Amino acid sequence: MSRRSRWAARSALAGVLLTLAAANTGGQTPTGIRDWDDGVKYARGQSVVPVFEGWVPNPDGTYSLVFGFWNRNWEETVYLPIGPENRIEPGGPDRGQPTVFTPRRGKNLFEIVVPKDFGNKEIVWTLTTRGKTEKAYGALVNQEVLTRRMVMAGGSLTAAAAAGNDDVGNESDPNKPPSITIDPVQPLTAPAPVTLTAAVSDDGVGAPPGATTRKTMRVVWSLYRAPTAAAFERSGNENDAQLAPTGGKATTMLRFKAPGTYVIRATATDVGGLATNKDVTVVVR
């Protein structure tokens, strides 16, 4: 496929995803997503598709290419280590991408900063699942420009973002994203569990008029990188959602089945819908 054809295809895909995101400002999964492939819900056995979400112009003149994924499975989490089956080029194979792909959609998960003179070059993310190869092409296409606020809102179109207002915390939308910190974790031996605590704070400002506002702040713990499955003890899954962190802290416990290096992500989302990610690395012997 030529570069021009790829750009046209990506633009069409971005338009569909943006429409779905706009329909999803209430936090519910849009009907269109459930029928994304062929109307059949596959529990497992399907591929994972890398997604180029768009790009954000940075104040220093550089650009941030934003990526996510689409796991076609409804129940199966797919693990793809960095390497031939999960690689980004040029500059890879490791450019900070996830290796854990939970069911369905993972939005705005990581960014790759490219220089001012990036021009019409491309960053290509390749995923191969069960012999099926899918690619995402990151490029500075006009139709795929995002704002920083849209990225923090997970693609939801708040009133400020829809108006092109990207000055976080300004007078028309004073809401600032939450801050989050996680203490480092000492190496441990499997199958010993680890307790993780995120300290979270927020300004308490809600969303602008006409936008979605949640009642409480939420913290979601998730596996971002892992060599194999590991489960949060409260949920039994690869993620653990918590509402209204007690005393500004969200604590979870994770038990590992095998040695390796794990990256656990905490995502804090405030009442106005803005989110902040923080990762912590755990080495399991």
Model-derived features with residue positions:
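Proline-centered linker/hinge motifs at extracellular inter-domain junctions
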Residues: 48, 144-184
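Residue-level recognition of secondary-structure-to-loop junctions
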Residues: 57, 251-258
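Short tyrosine-centred short linear motifs in exposed loops/low-complexity segments
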Residues: 61, 116-121, 191-192, 258-262
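Low-complexity "stalk/linker" and mucin-like segments enriched in Ser/Thr/Pro/Ala/Gly
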Residues: 98, 212-252
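Acidic, Ser/Thr
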Residues: 198-212, 222-224
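Short, solvent-exposed loop/turn segments at the edges of extracellular beta-sandwich modules
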Residues: 269-274
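C-terminal edge beta-strand
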Residues: 277-284
